[in-house]
Amino acid sequence: MKVVLFRDGRPGVAAALPGEAPETELSDLLGGEPDVTPLGTRLELLTLHDAERQQLPIRYSLHRIGRAAEPVAGDAVVVRVGADRNYRDADGNDVEAANCYLRPTGR
């Protein structure tokens, strides 16, 4: 499965996850149980559950129309979701859209 990976305060890049169980792989990638935030109709932001409580650094800010920017602690993954709510491979347009939503803070 192809996702958009945000790591170490850098812009998101396309990354392929090996294997058959994307939910397990995403949990392993983030280091624990993910929180899911919808980004429009076809993308979801996955961040580490309780990342702020674990005192991870704020590396990104989430930008959505009509809302103030929200801090995002630690690394993140953006996944594409189909109409059936199953994960799909992210494409170049998804990478571009994900980088509009999630921006490095420069810290």
Task: Give short role names for the model-derived ranges.
Residues M1-R107:
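Short beta-rich binding modules
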